[in-house]
Amino acid sequence: MNRELKTRIIVLKNQLKVFTMQTLAVTEAITTLSEAERKFGLSRSESKDFFTEWYDQLPEINPNDRANLEILWRRYIYHRSGGHLLESTVMLLLVLPLLTIAGLYDPPFRIKAEESIAINVSDSEETLQGRIDVLVLRDRLWIIVLESKKTMLSVWSALPQTLAYLMASPNSDRPTFAMLANGDNIVFVKLDGKQYAMSQVLSPLVDRGELEVAWQVLRKITHNEI
C-alpha cells in the first residue's frame, strides 16, 4: 500500500470518527439547562396546549397488555426492594420490557443505541457521577436512562443533554420526544422548533397506574406522532 493511499484511509477514518462523535461531544459539553437554552436558543413553553400528547386522548390498554404491565411492575418492585439498582439493571428490568410491551421492537420501528455519556451533577456537598444510556427510535423518540453507582440521579439531571440530543435530530421540522427514566421516575419531553416542555413526573415505583400511563404515552407518541 503506497503512502498516498494510507494517508487517504487515515483521513477517512478520522472524518468518520468526528462524524460519529459530534452529537456525543455536544451532549457532554452541555451540563446545565441554561447552557442548553442559550446554545440552541430554546425556551420552555408554559402553554398547556403545547404538550398534550402525554395526557390527552391516551390509547386504551387491552387486557393482555395490562396483565404484562402488572407482571413488569411486580418484577421491578421485587428487585427494587433489595436496594438501589446499579448499572444497566434499570434498562434491563424496566425500560426494555416497557418498550417490548408497547410493541416498539416490531415493524415499522427500528431502535439504535447511542454511545453512553458521563454526567456529573454538583450539589452543595458533593459531585454525583453517573451515566446516560440512550436509545433512539426512528430519530423521533429518545429513550434516556440515568444510572449512578452511589445514588439515584433525578430525571431532571439529564434534561440539558436530552435537549441536545433532540436538537441534533435530522427531523428538526417535526416535533421530537424523549422519555427520561431513572427507575423510580419517568418524565417525557417534547421539543418543537425552539420550544420545549415536560410532562408531570410519573412514579411507577409508587403507583402501578403511572407505569400504565407511561405505556399509554409511548403508544400515543410512537403510533400517532412518529
Identify what each model region corresponds to.
Residues 180-182:
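Central hydrophobic cores of alpha-helical transmembrane segments
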Residues 8, 13-175, 187-226:
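A short, conserved, highly charged catalytic patch centered on acidic carboxylates
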